[in-house]
């Protein structure tokens, strides 16, 4: 399993940057996790969009879905040019709510919508995927994702505050992609559906994850500052997200 960081910034992309998006590849599947602003421009460095097997959306906040409409339009054009069969729309797996967002996911013959929740398990190629609702604070659902293939486990934490029930879902993951939206110095007084870098590191350590990728960072953050606040994670390699970073499991 190979994970490529296509975007990691939030709430907006910095110069030459992109908000969240991760390409996950195995021998038989190519999946995009979230599709934020600038993600498609990065995806093209590794894969034509018409070779994607599925798109999984954690939730509908703009920084995670900004490029979805462009992806839909691009796939439609590639179908017109016979680069992707018209009878092979791209499945988009995403929450049902807000309904206005999920209803926009089917687009001509290019894309179809498939609902996700904690009761659903899907298979894409050799990947088995399950979901966990996270503590993201504003009432609309957000789902973490657990991807399993060839004995390896990737957990994408999406957006999450401190009250997500990770036990039994992320324990011992080979890689935990965990948000660290805030540094110590800009942490809000009350939790608002996000974690600090320090909290992300402590969480991964408590869960016994084999490696950690800290993401969902302001474009202005200096990587060495992020790294210094992640030192509580000692169980394995700690990666700080950057565009183009690839991790093999």
Language-model regions, residue ranges each:
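Active-site metal-binding motif and surrounding structural segment of the metallo-beta-lactamase
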Residues: 38-88
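Metal-dependent catalytic neighborhoods of phosphoester/phosphodiester hydrolases
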Residues: 67-75, 101-104, 222-230
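Core dinuclear metal-dependent hydrolase active-site scaffold
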Residues: 1-46, 115-168, 246-249
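Cap/insert and terminal regions of metallo-dependent hydrolase folds
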Residues: 162-245
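Active-site neighborhood of phospho(di)ester-bond hydrolases with catalytic His/Asp-centered motifs
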Residues: 32-36, 53-60, 94-95, 154-160, ...
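A short helix->loop->beta-strand "cap" motif at the edges of active sites that frequently abuts
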Residues: 29, 83-90, 207-211, 236
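Acidic/polar short surface loop at catalytic or gating sites that assists cofactor/ion binding
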Residues: 73-113
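Short acidic-hydrophobic, aromatic-tinged amphipathic segments that line or gate anion-handling sites
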Residues: 113-117, 240-241
